[in-house]
Structure formats: C-alpha cells, structure tokens
C-alpha cells in the first residue's frame, strides 16, 4: 500500500504528511455531498449557508458571496451581508445552443441581482447574485434545458476545457467529444445534486459509490483540458491534466498527456508557486479514459490532505517526483507512455471576427471585454446576443478567453447576424489588439477572495497601456499578453502572461514579467505591492526599451528575459522566488 490514513493522519510512500485538514472531516461527514444543505435552504432568517454547507455547495457548482460594495453600509444598519450565490455551469468545451442561451438570458434578467451573464476563463458561464429563494429555481431551470453545475467547484474534476477551433471543424468535433467523455467519466456519481436541487427521489446512502473520486473526493480542485495545437487558448499550464491533440490528415489519432500545471499561490508562502505541466508522453485514443482516471486516482491517493495550500497535483509531482508519479499512472492505466509526438503552441488569443471553416460554414467570434454580457448605455451586448440566438441555427461556443463564437452560420444567415451584432455593439473594429489580449477575473464586488480590483480596473488600465504603446511608436500588432487577477488564486491566469498583475491590497498589485505568447513560461515578480500609477511608470520604461532594443518579431516577454530585466523561470520550485 503506497498510502494510508490512520489516526487522522496521512502517510504517502512512507512519508507522514500530518493531521488531516478540516475539509477532510467535512467531506467525510457530508454523506456524499449532501450535508444539511436542504435544511439550510428552508432557513429564511439568513440568506447564507452554515459553515460546512458554505463549503459543500461548491461541489454543486456554487460559491456563497455578497456584495462587498455595500457590506460596510449594511453592517452600519445592523444587517448581515447581502448573501447570494454565484453559479458556474458545467459546459464541457463551452458549447451551448441558442435555445439554452435564451433560457439562461431570461433567468439572469429576472432572477439575479446584476442581470448579467459572465463568460469565464473556465469556458463556461456564471450567474452572479442569485438569492437563496431562487437557487432551486436556478438549478431546475438549467436542468430543463439540459445543463447542470455538478462539480464546477470543490475538490473534484472541474469543467473540462476544449480548444475552440471552428475552422478545422471535424478535428474540433472529435476533440470536443473527448472533452465530454472525460467530463462524464470523472464526474461525481453521488445522487445528492438531483435529490437537493431537482427534487429527486431520496436513495439510501449505501447506494452511493465514488469509484474514481472516492468517498472524500480529491485533496483539492482538479482541472482538465483537451487542446488542439498550435492554439493554447485553454492555457494548458494552468491545468492539472491536459490532452494535447495529435492529428494525422485532419483526423485525431491520440494525445500527448501533460500533468501538473497550476497557477495558484499564497502571498508570503514560498512553498506555493505557479508551475508548468510536465509532458508524460503520447497515448492512443483508446487509452484516454484509462489515463484520465489513473492520473486522478493517483492524485486522489497521493495528494496532500493535510495542507490544502500544498494539495494540488503540481505539488504532489514535486514532492514524490515526476517519474514516480508517471510510473504509478502507467501501472494504474495498464500502459506505457510513448515518446511525445511533436507539437508547438504559438498563440492563445481568439480570432475576432468572421472565419470560414473547411466545412463551408461561417463562424463569428465576438470580443466580450472581461466576458461580462450586460446592456451598457449605447452597447446593449446582452440583448444583442439574445437577438442573435433567436435567429441562429448553429450553436454558440464560449472560449477560455471569455469571448463568444457564433458558430455554424450559413451563408444565407451571415448578413443578418452581422447586422444584429453591429447594432448592439458586439462588433467594433475600433477595439485594439492590445485590448483583445487582455483579461481579468471578476474580483470586486462579488468575489470574497479579491484583494484588489480586476474586472472593473482592467478597461481603463488597458487604455493607459495603449497610450504607452502609441507613445513609443509601436504598431497595433505589437501588443502584450496582459492579465490581472484580484488575488493570488489565479483565476485571471496572470501567471502565464507577459505582464501579470496579482492583487495584493486595494489599489496595489505585484507586477510579474516574463511570460510568452504561447503560454509556455511562468513570469516572475518584478515589483511588489505597487500602485497602478507606479505600474504604468514601470511599463512605460520597459516598453520604451522594448521598442528600441528588441530583435525582429521579438515579443515583450521574450525581450524582458533576453536582456536580463527578469530571470527566466524554468523550474518553478527552484526559480520562482530565487
């Protein structure tokens, strides 16, 4: 036995990791994720959930939040915070039909505090500001259109991402089908979701079984992608498990498997760090689900259940050794990884505007700044997408860059859809390449973990950066992958950007430099805890040097490493804080 839990302590490969964290107690006592959520739903005295259920609802795809803009004012009035939930839907590969879209649009308008639909870096949508009396209605509305939110949060395999490649339609369809299969294979098997939210028939707990995830589920969240090179729109190095599509003559034949990526860290704790995924090798298609389960169960058994800050797969690999972890996966899956097939990641951005697929269908990628679909003055974006949904015969594809593709448009419908998009501000040639390559997480006012602004901060910040690029005579193609995340948990994927800002306190950020265009290098901290004004001053100086000293076609991140402005991070555990 390579692992054991005795006397509330965890031992892995002979090493005692310590006393189990309280989250392990919570999961053990939850009766396969049921807890006392149903009782909490009946309690109308508070808008929130009790301590254990506050954590357990995450496994059902929700986070308890409140409006931090009004928290202090409510406290003065002797009121509890305005508790509500954010829901993240499970949409493997980000594909949603027009009928489904119209239903989620209606729910967001009628039953959420903010009336918005938020496209996220997890290639799905979120509802924000849903009050307790509307939570069950939300789940039942989604269920009626074939959507759920099972395992989009919590210590489970989360929404499976897939490259949105509308041009190579057949290859994308194959990759998407695998994303769906992986999602279903790794999904929790408990009936708790149906019982609580869909008024499903109660079953005896002895019928529950979790053959892959186990009774206490995973040590920490787990993220999986299917990616089609050379596009790295899903950011493989932000994820625990990645299947890199290998094709011959446009047909999918197998995957290279990358394991152990992840971006979250904790300020001031050098045992935490962002990390690139390791390439385990190539597998044929028929071994995909076996390998997925083997990686997940190895992490289930070997991951740190004592210290949640060191519980993710990336730390397990660094603790036990990549070769040891890989050998265990091979043993459990009954395979030997072959040598990786050649591939390269060159870009991550979405191709905004129209493209024609090899199947003759047209696809329109709409740039949605920060993924927030709402009706703004003069730009009724949310209404615009709903109007398109009313006439669109194909599907919509949410991207991991928080944009939206109107996919599978016939030639006869193309002009009508473009007209609607332009009328509602969804197509705008005035949007710069720099803005298209910038991204932020939600942060304030709804995220309880945010230390600084991100989504509300980014638009003006990008305008300021655009001014700096213009000042130094750079062309519109000379843009920088720029990302802002409101806290070190990394939802905005700033730790794979050429310029990454990580929130430290209100109005203050850590400035990281040195990522690259393809998302294959972790940036390093350049300045700590500085204001946005100071950040812009630093960027001004750095961009000035880049404009004058760069090599032909040298991107900003590569330049900062080459000239020694920042040291390259090769092995994160060794280099990130060095």
UniProtKB/Swiss-Prot annotation:
A Pfam family it matches: NIR_SIR_ferr
Cofactor descriptive note: Binds 1 siroheme per subunit.
Its EC number(s): 1.8.1.2
Cofactor: siroheme; [4Fe-4S] cluster
Pathway named in the protein's UniProt entry: Sulfur metabolism; hydrogen sulfide biosynthesis; hydrogen sulfide from sulfite (NADPH route): step 1/1
Gene Ontology annotations of biological process type: cysteine biosynthetic process; hydrogen sulfide biosynthetic process; sulfate assimilation
Metal-binding keyword on record: yes
GO cellular component labels: sulfite reductase complex (NADPH)
Residues engaged in binding [4Fe-4S] cluster: 441, 447, 487, 491
GO molecular function list: 4 iron, 4 sulfur cluster binding; heme binding; metal ion binding; NADP binding; sulfite reductase (ferredoxin) activity; sulfite reductase (NADPH) activity
Catalytic activity: hydrogen sulfide + 3 NADP(+) + 3 H2O = sulfite + 3 NADPH + 4 H(+)
Keywords: 4Fe-4S, Amino-acid biosynthesis, Cysteine biosynthesis, Heme, Iron, Iron-sulfur, Metal-binding, NADP, Oxidoreductase
Residues that coordinate or bind siroheme: 491
HAMAP family xref list: CysI
Subunit structure of this chain's protein: Alpha(8)-beta(8). The alpha component is a flavoprotein, the beta component is a hemoprotein.
Role played: Component of the sulfite reductase complex that catalyzes the 6-electron reduction of sulfite to sulfide. This is one of several activities required for the biosynthesis of L-cysteine from sulfate.
Family: Belongs to the nitrite and sulfite reductase 4Fe-4S domain family.
Name recorded for this polypeptide: Sulfite reductase [NADPH] hemoprotein beta-component
Organism: Vibrio vulnificus (strain CMCP6)
Gene: cysI
């Amino acid at each position: 036995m390579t692992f054991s839990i005795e006397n509330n302590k965890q031992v892995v490969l002979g090493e005692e990791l310590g006393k189990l964290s309280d989250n392990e107690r919570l999961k053990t006592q939850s009766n396969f994720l049921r807890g006392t959520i149903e009782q909490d739903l009946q309690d109308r005295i508070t808008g929130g959930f009790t301590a254990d259920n506050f954590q357990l609802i995450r496994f059902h795809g929700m986070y308890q939040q409140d409006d931090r803009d009004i928290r202090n004012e409510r406290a003065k009035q002797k009121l509890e915070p305005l508790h509500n939930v954010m829901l993240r839907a499970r949409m493997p590969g980000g594909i949603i039909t027009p009928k489904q879209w119209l239903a989620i649009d209606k729910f967001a308008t009628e039953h959420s505090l903010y009336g918005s639909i938020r496209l996220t870096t997890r290639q799905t949508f979120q509802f924000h500001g849903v009050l307790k009396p509307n939570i069950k209605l939300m789940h039942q509305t989604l269920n009626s259109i074939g959507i759920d939110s099972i395992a989009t949060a919590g210590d489970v395999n989360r929404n499976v991402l897939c490259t949105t490649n509308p041009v190579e339609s057949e290859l994308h369809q194959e990759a998407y089908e695998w994303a769906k299969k992986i999602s279903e294979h790794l999904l929790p098997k408990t009936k708790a979701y149906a019982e609580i939210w869909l008024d499903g028939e109660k079953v005896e707990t002895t019928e529950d079984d979790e053959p892959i995830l186990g009774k206490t589920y995973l040590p920490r969240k787990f993220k999986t992608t299917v990616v089609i090179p050379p596009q790295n729109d899903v950011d493989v190095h932000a994820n625990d498990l990645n299947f890199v599509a290998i094709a011959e003559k446009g047909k999918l034949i197998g995957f290279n498997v990358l394991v152990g990526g992840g971006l979250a860290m904790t300020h001031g704790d050098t045992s935490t760090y962002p990390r690139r995924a390791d390439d385990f090798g190539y597998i044929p298609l028929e071994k995909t689900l076996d390998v997925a389960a083997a990686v997940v169960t190895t992490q289930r058994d070997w991951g740190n259940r004592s210290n949640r800050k060191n519980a993710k797969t990336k730390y397990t690999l660094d603790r036990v050794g990549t070769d040891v972890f890989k050998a265990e996966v091979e043993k459990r899956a009954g395979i030997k990884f072959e040598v990786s097939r050649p591939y390269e990641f060159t870009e991550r951005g979405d191709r905004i505007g129209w493209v024609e697929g090899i199947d003759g269908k047209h696809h329109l990628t709409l740039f949605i700044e920060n993924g927030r679909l709402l009706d703004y003055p003069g730009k009724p974006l949310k209404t615009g997408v709903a109007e398109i949904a009313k006439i669109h015969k194909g599907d919509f594809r949410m991207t991991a860059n928080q944009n939206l593709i109107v996919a599978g448009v016939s030639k006869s419908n193309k002009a009508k859809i473009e007209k609607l998009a332009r009328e509602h501000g969804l197509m705008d040639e005035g949007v710069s390449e720099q803005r298209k390559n910038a991204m932020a997480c939600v942060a304030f006012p709804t995220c309880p973990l945010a230390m600084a602004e991100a989504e509300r901060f980014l638009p003006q910040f990008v305008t300021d950066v655009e001014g700096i690029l213009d000042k130094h005579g750079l062309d519109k193609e000379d843009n920088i992958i720029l990302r802002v995340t409101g806290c070190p948990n990394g939802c905005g994927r700033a730790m794979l950007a050429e310029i990454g800002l990580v929130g430290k306190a209100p109005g203050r950020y850590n400035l990281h430099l040195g990522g690259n265009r393809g998302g294959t290098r972790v940036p390093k901290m350049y300045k700590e805890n500085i204001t946005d004004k100071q950040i812009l001053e630093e960027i001004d100086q750095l961009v000035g040097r880049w404009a004058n000293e760069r090599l032909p076609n040298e991107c900003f991140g590569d330049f900062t490493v080459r000239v020694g402005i920042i040291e390259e991070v090769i092995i994160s555990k060794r280099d990130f804080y060095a």
